Amino acid sequence: MKNKTEYYDQFISKIPNFPKKGVLFYDITSVLLKPEVYSSLINEVYSFYNFKKIDCIAVVESRGYLIGAPLSLKMQLPLVLIRKEGKLPREVFSEEYELEYGFGRIEVHKDDVRTYSNILLIDDILATGGTLKSSAILLERAGGKVKDIFCFIELCAINGRQSLESYEVNSLVRYN
């Protein structure tokens, strides 16, 4: 996927010391304030994945939803939600994950994933790779197979891609 850092960087807000001191938070919600930029993002991802063999899109709560939901509609594919612990009403698989700034737990409905063999997993940012790795493990434990991973932003210096080396990982914006 072509690196589009120069273009999108101007629309991404950077908030120092959030959610805790020493962390620089990359806020993609500012992209949503510019419909033409948001549309461009969705179209870029669509153009890259439209001709790949994808049968489902899985998204990580919550900012992954902002990319995955419109993309699933555009590609006419099912959308599977990966949520934080305690937010899903049916029986779930769960997995602990490590963040750049702590730990958490994610869940997916047991019966949402079982037949998909070419899942595109989407999140807004790749930092440590902990959330995405745990999400991939979760989807595979539920019977699916992750084919590709897409993140809008990749923090290359943290080297989260290394923990995802068994997957094809793509990003549009790469910060060193």
Curated annotation (Swiss-Prot):
One of its GO terms (molecular function) is adenine phosphoribosyltransferase activity. Pathway: Purine metabolism; AMP biosynthesis via salvage pathway; AMP from adenine: step 1/1. Keywords: Cytoplasm, Glycosyltransferase, Purine salvage, Transferase. It catalyses: AMP + diphosphate = 5-phospho-alpha-D-ribose 1-diphosphate + adenine. It is an enzyme of class 2 (transferase). One of its GO terms (cellular component) is cytoplasm. GO terms for biological process: adenine salvage; AMP salvage; purine ribonucleoside salvage. It is found in: Cytoplasm. Its EC number is 2.4.2.7. Pfam families: Pribosyltran. HAMAP family: Aden_phosphoribosyltr. Homodimer. Belongs to the purine/pyrimidine phosphoribosyltransferase family. Catalyzes a salvage reaction resulting in the formation of AMP, that is energically less costly than de novo synthesis. This is Adenine phosphoribosyltransferase. It comes from Borreliella burgdorferi (strain ATCC 35210 / DSM 4680 / CIP 102532 / B31). The gene is apt.
